[in-house]
């Protein structure tokens, strides 16, 4: 019987150099997608997929991420006194959205090391990992698509998306065999292959469901590209020793860790809003005509 997945790890310790100078004072995960930060979108993806026990891997200067989901007594009292019930309900909803805890990554040593920092909090059970730079809109949600594959095969699963031709060297790329629909049994993973040497165009998409066996593998993984412990290197070892699956995610993906991708994400989410969508569309079309 496959053990159910109850926990999710959200690595949020990155400095956010691509968004300087704003990230000098504000964690990049709190940059708004209209009026909701990217981290909330990922937390809600977890919750809507049945994951309410969430572990954030933070670093120095990232306490605001935990504060965002914590009770804000003075703010709530103020909103109540002013009769702003809609805003009060919005704030209180954040308090009860999920059970969120934090562990520290004491130094920047890569994504693999960030996941390893959550080892004690996760314990000996399978868990999900969501990268905050990758935003997904899908039905079912992105991580739920992985959970369904994990429940069927009982092996680690990575989310996949098809990258444009010529951009394979920018991503972790997989080689695999289709086993039905959008699911693949993976043969190997390559972190940012040299141009022209990628085994496919299927890239790892910032969503993972992993068995606890990944932790000892991570602990023994030597620093790779950039002197960091790469999660992809550990996944390659897991793939060879225990097997690994991939699922091509159905839905829309935005790379909110890139300036252009971030702006596109804001625009897309704004266009879908019933309160501002029409005005944003009209304004954007006017700007395009004038540019």
Say what each PLM segment does.
Residues 2-8, 278-285:
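Positively charged, low-complexity intrinsically disordered leader regions
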Residues 2-84, 141-145:
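N-terminal glycine-rich phosphate-binding loop and ensuing alpha1 helix
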Residues 7, 52-54, 99, 126, ...:
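Residues at the starts of beta-strands that form the adenosine-phosphate
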Residues 14, 60, 134, 141, ...:
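Alpha-helix/helix-capping structural signal
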Residues 75-80, 85-176, 212, 219-221:
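Conserved beta-loop-beta/alpha segment of the NTase-like Rossmann-fold superfamily
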């Amino acid at each position: 019987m496959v053990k159910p997945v109850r926990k999710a790890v959200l690595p949020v310790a990155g400095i956010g150099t691509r968004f300087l100078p704003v990230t000098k004072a504000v964690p990049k995960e709190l940059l708004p997608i209209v009026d909701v930060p990217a981290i909330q979108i990922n937390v809600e993806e977890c919750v809507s997929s049945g994951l309410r026990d969430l572990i954030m891997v933070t670093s120095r200067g990232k306490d605001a991420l935990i504060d965002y989901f914590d009770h804000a007594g003075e703010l709530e009292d103020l909103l109540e006194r002013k009769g702003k019930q809609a805003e009060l309900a919005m704030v209180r909803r954040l308090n009860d959205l999920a059970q969120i805890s934090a562990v520290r990554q004491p130094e920047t040593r890569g994504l693999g090391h960030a996941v390893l920092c959550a080892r004690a909090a996760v314990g000996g059970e399978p868990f999900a990992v969501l990268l905050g730079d990758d935003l997904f809109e899908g039905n079912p949600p992105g991580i739920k698509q992985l959970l369904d594959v994990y429940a069927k095969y009982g092996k680690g699963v990575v989310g996949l998306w098809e990258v444009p031709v010529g951009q394979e060297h920018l991503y972790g790329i997989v080689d695999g065999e289709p086993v039905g629909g959008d699911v693949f049994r993976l043969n190997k993973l390559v972190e940012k292959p040299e141009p022209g040497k990628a085994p496919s165009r299927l890239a790892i998409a910032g969503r993972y469901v992993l068995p606890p066996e990944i932790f000892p593998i991570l602990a023994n993984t030597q620093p790779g590209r950039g002197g960091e412990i790469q999660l992809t290197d550990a996944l390659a070892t897991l793939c060879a020793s225990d097997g690994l699956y991939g699922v091509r995610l159905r839905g829309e993906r935005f790379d909110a860790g890139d300036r252009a991708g971030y702006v596109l994400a804001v625009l897309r989410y704004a266009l879908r809003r019933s309160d501002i969508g029409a005005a944003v569309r009209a304004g954007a079309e006017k700007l395009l005509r004038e540019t």
